[in-house]
Amino acid sequence: STLMRSSAASDVYKRQKRYMASSEFDKVWTSCESLLAKYHKDNPLHGGMKVAELRQKLFKGADRARADAILSCLAREGKIKSVADRYALADFEVRLTKKQNALKTKLLQIYHKMGLEVENLDDVYVQFERNELADCKQVLESLVSGGELVMLTPQLCIERRIYEDIWEKTKQHFAEHGELTLAEFRDMLGTSRKYALAVLEYYDKNKILKKDGDVRHPGPEF
């Protein structure tokens, strides 16, 4: 999980800072600042760049634990900040227009009302005026990148609070059992197969769980 990765990164923080030459650290920061500044300019409504993308662009094939420790170090020094599964420059803020803020409020109200059993995005967009659609799609991307919504599939988003509740139930299950089936997960969430499968496939894609035949086990990102 993100929390466990953060803990692991903090464990090596002092060692990382100690053996990394200040000139090398400054060089990494300069590159990081440049990458994120360009990303923010190109994507002003996104909360930040995905951690995996930043790690790959900044460190190429370097050891992942070391890369995460350096990023954690930059965050501790107030140079960058963690936003959901992304990083942003510390002083970056998403700025929405008055119209976009109104769309944001409406979108959040819609998703709050739906809970887990959400409509497809196409059906959500139908609830907006045609001339609002372009802005609406940008605002939804902003809500996903900022962590307020979690995009399970290209058509299904859920509120962050719903996702966190599901994640707690998932962790509790694996604290007591070694594997998980789709039927067990569906019953655990009290929902239909469609939504249970969407969450499981999101877990698979993000290596939180690993599918093995008809069951799933904790993955490397659990």
Task: Please provide the spans of the model-predicted regions.
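Short amphipathic alpha-helical interface segments
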Residues: 1, 29-49, 100-119, 163-182
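C-terminal tails and terminal domains of large nucleic-acid-associated
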Residues: 177-222
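Short helix-coil junctions and helix-kink-helix linkers
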Residues: 1, 51-64, 123-133, 184-193
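C-terminal structural cap/anchor segments
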Residues: 106-145
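Short amphipathic alpha-helical interaction segments
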Residues: 7-8, 61-70, 130-142, 192-201
